[in-house]
């Protein structure tokens, strides 16, 4: 097979955006991710839960003063999955080069 399968969990636009942010920042707070992705808080929360359930990110809920603070951090499993996704995507782009 010329094409490598794409991870369906990462193929969703918002989850891919979250992973892309975390791959370069390692960790980020929820408001930053929300701002950078242009997502609603509800949708982002659902997508973060899916990534967390898969073990791609870890979510830490703390407080900054009296305000809740959610921090997302990419895991080594998430890094490997993202790298595999990028390589699989390249297999689609390089077909014409062969």
Regions found by a protein language model. Name each.
Residues 48-51:
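Basic amphipathic alpha-helical segments that dock to polyanions
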Residues 74-78:
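Accessory beta->alpha helical hairpin/"wing" motif in late/C-terminal subdomains of nucleic-acid enzymes
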Residues 1-3, 20, 79-98:
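Amphipathic alpha-helical dimerization/coiled-coil segments
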Residues 59:
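Short beta-strand "wing" residues that participate in macromolecule-binding interfaces
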Residues 55:
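Glycine-centered, phosphate/nucleic-acid-interacting loop/turn motifs that mediate DNA/RNA or nucleotide
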Residues 2-40, 62-64, 71-73:
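N-terminal helix-turn-helix DNA-binding core of bacterial DNA-binding proteins
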């Amino acid at each position: 097979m010329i094409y490598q399968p794409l991870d369906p969990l990462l193929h969703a636009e918002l989850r891919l955006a979250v992973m892309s942010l975390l791959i370069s920042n390692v960790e980020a707070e929820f408001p930053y991710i929300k701002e950078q992705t242009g997502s609603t808080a509800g949708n982002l929360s659902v997508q973060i839960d899916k990534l967390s359930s898969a073990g791609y990110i870890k979510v830490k809920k703390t407080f900054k003063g009296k305000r809740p603070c959610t921090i997302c951090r990419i895991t080594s499993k998430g890094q490997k999955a993202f790298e595999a996704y990028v390589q699989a995507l390249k297999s689609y782009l390089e077909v014409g080069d062969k």
